[in-house]
A protein has these predicted regions:
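Structural cue for short, hydrophobic secondary-structure segments
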Residues: 6, 69-71
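SAM cofactor-binding core of SAM-dependent methyltransferases
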Residues: 2-58
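Class I S-adenosyl-L-methionine
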Residues: 58-67, 74-192
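Active-site glycine-rich loops that stabilize anionic/oxyanionic intermediates
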Residues: 10-11, 72-74
Length: 192
């Protein structure tokens, strides 16, 4: 059985998806000062039963896990942000979380979601920094840019996923191209 945790989860969707995949709750949540208001709903979802570790206060994780996920703020590279730039301080959350997870937790896989521009020329300096962190800690770094429409969803949303794989082997992802549902059908299918 795989064990897992989240760092700077921000939103619940990815964390809840991890629980659905692994059929087990996270061992802990890792966070930094400034994210508490955003994460409160996720803590409430788990009835405050999951250890909530604030790294800014010097708290430490208690055990290693196989997988760690993150949804770091993406405003640094978002096309919706007027301040988007490769040197935006918002991008530092990807760097800071990668440094902690890869040096302290040392999972088999650390992965996250970010804006599509992470896989573009604008994101290249960030990718280079992440790749250096990976190499320094015995990981291989990869990115995967996709669109929600390719996964059968009616929402138009481009995203980039980034991965740190322990060692030098990277799995080959299957190309997915599912016909998207219609938003009207999705709305009609909601149980009331």
């Amino acid at each position: 059985m795989n064990t897992w945790a989240s760092i700077v989860p921000l939103i619940g969707g990815e964390t809840i998806a991890m629980e659905n995949i692994f059929k087990t709750k996270p061992k802990y949540f890792l966070t930094f000062d400034g994210f508490q208001a955003n994460e409160e709903h996720l803590l409430n979802y788990y009835n405050n039963e999951i250890p909530y570790i604030n790294l800014s206060k010097g708290e430490k994780h208690t055990e290693g896990v196989d997988v760690v996920n993150t949804v770091c703020p993406c405003a640094g590279l978002s096309s919706l942000s007027p301040q988007a730039a490769s040197n935006s301080p918002m991008n530092d959350w990807m760097i800071k979380s990668a440094e902690y997870v890869l040096t302290e937790v040392k999972p088999k896989v650390f992965w996250g979601e970010n804006a599509p521009r992470l896989a573009s020329k604008m994101g290249e300096p960030v990718v280079k920094r992440l790749r250096k962190i990976a190499e320094a800690n015995g990981y291989t770094f990869s990115i995967f840019k996709t669109k929600s429409l390719l996964h059968g969803l009616s929402q138009v949303r481009d995203r980039t996923f980034y991965f740190f794989w322990k060692g030098d082997q990277v799995p080959m992802f299957e190309y997915i191209d599912r016909k998207p549902s219609l938003i009207a059908d999705d709305i009609r299918s909601i149980k009331r």
